[in-house]
Amino acid sequence: QSAVSIQIKKLESTLGLQLIERNSKNFKLTFAGKELFKMSQDVFEKISRMENEMKKILQYKKGKISIGATHNIGEPVLPRIMVEFRKQYPEIEFDLYIKNKESLVKHLKEGTVDIALMEEYFIEDKEIKVIETEDYPFVVVAGKEITNLDELQNIPLLKRDTILTNKYLDLFEKIVGFNLDKRISVNGSIETMKNLIKDGLGFAILPYYSVHEEVERGALKLVHKFEKSEDRFQIVLIRENEDKEGISKFVEFLENYKINRDNAPLVTKVKKTKK
């Protein structure tokens, strides 16, 4: 018998429950075994978080926060957030991770990431706390050479396949009064889409937070700003960590941070040609 089998039998004897159904060829977990496995996963995740926290303290002699974000938030927004956070809290050190949503949740539970910023994402986990931020608007942006809405009929729509993009696309077609049949699907990041627009390959419907700097500089032209804002960020963290000093300060900073930048000057919207 292997050492593992011996330990499992000892555990079964201690609990008074059969954890594994055995036969000559294979085995499977009993109901009790499956429940114990689920609970043990939580224990291992907590141990992993503890080990990662101790490594940070050992390496930096003080607390250090690890901040994660999805690509669509991390590339256009996170650098600006961290510059302003550093001005307010220069003593707090941090690491940054740019991952997809699933990876961020995994790293949160393992303790390699303390806080994650992501688009709305359903998370059903009692250990995880989700804080909703302010709403932010979507806009239509094009290259700086565009002077009226009718010109959009001649260039492709660069389209991200998301529910909100499809919704705002339908609304925009009603506003301009013609169908946007020329389309290019783009599976890359928002930064990729912005570069394609700058190079004159099309226009796009994007969150305003991701393009407002280019609009201010005149690198992109604001074609239309939708009046209703209904999408938002999520600040995601492990509940047991929310009172740690560096984490609580960063969360408070994010809750007060104005992503929309409503006071930022906008380029005058282009008009639809009168007929």
Task: State where each predicted segment sits.
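Central regulatory/effector-binding core of bacterial HTH transcription factors
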Residues: 62-123
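A short LG(V/I)-centered, amphipathic sequence patch enriched
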Residues: 12-31
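Secondary-structure junction motif
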Residues: 156-179, 244, 251, 260-270
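Alpha-helical linker/hinge and terminal dimerization helices associated
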Residues: 14-15, 36-58
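Hydrophobic hinge/microswitch elements
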Residues: 100-105, 109-112, 178-223, 227-229
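Flexible hinge/capping segments at coil-to-helix
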Residues: 128-166
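A late-sequence structural motif
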Residues: 223-265
